[in-house]
């Protein structure tokens, strides 16, 4: 398991480095990071405040309302991007937003949630509560980046599949 996870993490950072070579690559990477962060925060805030039916036994603290909150909060970075792109006339901000970006945010949120559930599943199998001790109370570093890893890998696969088909 740790070998597979190490490979996925390496693949994530290699693809992230590749993305940053593109003209707007840094903005795209920051955008993906923001979507993942807002998705995590939205799931936590809405899940804790609304509560409700549990999402799965794999991760018993996750609720359906939290998942919906993740999807909704994942759209916030669009507003942040629009705000900063209106303040700045820099070429970095020529990344165009349309309906596909909204769908992309929702897909990134879905990948983040799936990544979180997959890591939770493996933690349950290994009978481990936290993946590390560096961030007490947060489940470790891996719990902070599990969604990001799966989001970037998902985007890589979607990108390759779409360009292969078209």
Task: Give the label of every model feature segment.
Residues 90-96, 138-139, 145, 164-165:
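Short, conserved aromatic-histidine micro-motifs
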Residues 79, 83, 125, 160:
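Active-site catalytic microenvironments for nucleophilic, acid-base chemistry
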Residues 25, 54, 130, 165-166:
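Secondary-structure boundary/capping signal
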Residues 36-52, 56, 64-65, 110-150:
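Acidic (Asp/Glu-rich) catalytic motifs at the cytosolic membrane interface
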Residues 70, 74-79, 112, 148-155:
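Hydrophobic alpha-helical transmembrane segments in multi-pass membrane proteins
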């Amino acid at each position: 398991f740790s070998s597979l996870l190490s490979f996925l993490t390496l693949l994530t950072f290699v693809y992230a480095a590749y993305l940053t070579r593109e003209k707007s690559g840094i903005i795209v990477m920051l955008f993906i990071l923001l979507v993942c962060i807002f998705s995590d925060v939205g799931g936590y805030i809405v899940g804790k405040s609304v509560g409700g039916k549990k999402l799965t036994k794999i991760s018993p603290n996750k609720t359906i309302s939290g998942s919906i909150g993740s999807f909704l909060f994942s759209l916030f970075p669009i507003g942040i991007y629009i705000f900063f792109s209106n303040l700045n006339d820099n070429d970095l901000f020529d990344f165009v937003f349309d309906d596909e970006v909204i769908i992309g945010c929702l897909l990134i949120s879905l990948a983040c949630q799936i990544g979180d559930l997959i890591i939770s599943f493996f933690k349950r199998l290994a009978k481990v509560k936290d993946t590390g001790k560096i961030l007490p109370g947060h489940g470790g570093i891996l719990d902070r980046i599990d969604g990001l890893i799966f989001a970037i890998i998902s985007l890589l696969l979607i990108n390759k599949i779409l360009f292969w088909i078209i």
